[in-house]
Amino acid sequence: MKNIFLHSLNLENYRNFKNLELKTDNTPIILIGENGSGKTNILEAISLFYPGRGLRSAKLANVCKTSEDHCLVKALLQSKLGLAEFTTQFKRSSNRRITEYNESKIANNELSKFTSMVWLTPHMEGIFTSGSSDRRKFLDRIVYNFDPKHAELVSKYEYYMHERNKILVEDRRDDNWLKIIEEKMADISNHIANNRLKTLEFMQQAIDDLENEFPKADLSIDGIVEQKILNGKKNIVSFITAELYQTRSKDKLLGRTSFGVHKSDFLVKHQKKNILAKFCSTGEQKAILIAIILAEMNYAIKLTKIAPILLLDEVFVHLDDKRRQYLIEFLTGLNMQLWVTTTNLEGIDNFATKAQLIKL
């Protein structure tokens, strides 16, 4: 098994940190400090070395320390391709983010070729009651760990969709280019939908196989393209292309693309109660979310032979003793780098003896 982990992390003008340097090993790491000390900021900085805008989905302008024009995050990281230096930096004045791998610029969506990461934050506990966009992004992040190329597909799809919207809204007479764009969107959509379905199959098996103290979930996806594939429809790409063509007039008025894999919803049910997670209590929702994360970790390691970095923000809060103890034993047995934030060590003191403590 190959472990992805940080050897060091350097922050410059990042959030509340003027300068911060951490040295770490392939072990559990506990960040302990009062609320507002910057624990979650450190997790967010690490999450920037994975496709997307980090675990907060923050705007670039909010990441730099107040009154500073630039900020920098640098990591010496054991990646899928070996030991490497990664940097990501922002400038308010240009509103640009630049990411580098061993001093060579790379696209944000390429990060999944080098790293693998899973995170759980208090904000995510509302994912079942929020909009479908949050759940869809959550599912796609899971897919990244099984298929690193998926991030690039999602990025390309969003680019072509944006181009299509511009052509329609600006009323350009460019049917040939529009046709090419829609054909590209259709082809990419087919790959995205199949990747999601394949990953859901893996994940459902992982959930059913893993005996633990958390409720099991049934996973599915509610999307026209995915359902057509499940129903065995042939010529999916042609079907999507035709739908995009037929919705041009409608989409021109709306100013957006009304059909496609960007409209799909990730559905989660409490398996035993047979009800959608959004109708469960907040405690049950958190427990279901943890169960999904544990299954993802377990199966990603089993299937890809790669252990991702795990970021857990205040995960032990409001867990009963039985579930807290199970989670500690599960995490300790993973033999990988995980980062945990907490305001105190109450209830996790035994776990702390096996971890690197960083006090803020």
Swiss-Prot record:
Compartment(s) of residence: Cytoplasm
GO molecular function: ATP binding; single-stranded DNA binding
Alphabetical UniProt keywords: ATP-binding, Cytoplasm, DNA damage, DNA repair, DNA replication, DNA-binding, Nucleotide-binding, SOS response
Main subcellular location of this protein, as a coarse class: cytoplasm
Keyword Nucleotidyltransferase: no
Positions contributing to ATP binding: G33, E34, N35, G36, S37, G38, K39, T40
Gene3D superfamilies, per the entry: P-loop containing nucleotide triphosphate hydrolases, RecF/RecN/SMC, N-terminal domain
Domain of life: Bacteria
GO cellular component: cytoplasm
GO biological process, one term: double-strand break repair
Family under the similarity heading: Belongs to the RecF family.
Function description: The RecF protein is involved in DNA metabolism; it is required for DNA replication and normal SOS inducibility. RecF binds preferentially to single-stranded, linear DNA. It also seems to bind ATP.
HAMAP family to which the protein is assigned, alphabetical: RecF
Protein's name according to its UniProt entry: DNA replication and repair protein RecF
Organism in which the protein naturally occurs: Rickettsia conorii (strain ATCC VR-613 / Malish 7)
